[in-house]
């Protein structure tokens, strides 16, 4: 990722779709870059690994479990995670 892309992530609203290993890694990276991160996964909240839920909660990351945002136009970037 170029330096300009990195600096451009500050305060951008990012939705990460899929919270497997690569989704968690993407969330970590986007938080470090200063993005406003939201995540979405088809699992119900109780099916999600408790450690992952703590990780997301501690970083004030909005989660859409078994749901999706009503208005996708609010996001500056979507990251599709394969798993």
Which residues fall in each region the model found?
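N-terminal leader/targeting and accessory segments in enzymes
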Residues: 1-83
């Amino acid at each position: 990722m170029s330096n300009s892309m990195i600096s451009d992530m500050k305060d951008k609203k990012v939705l990460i779709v899929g919270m497997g290993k690569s989704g968690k890694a993407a969330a970590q990276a986007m938080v470090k870059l200063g993005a406003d991160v939201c995540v979405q996964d088809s699992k119900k909240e109780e099916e999600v690994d408790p450690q992952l839920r703590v990780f997301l909660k501690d970083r004030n990351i909005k989660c859409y479990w078994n749901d999706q945002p009503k208005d996708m136009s609010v996001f500056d970037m979507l990251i599709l995670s394969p798993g």
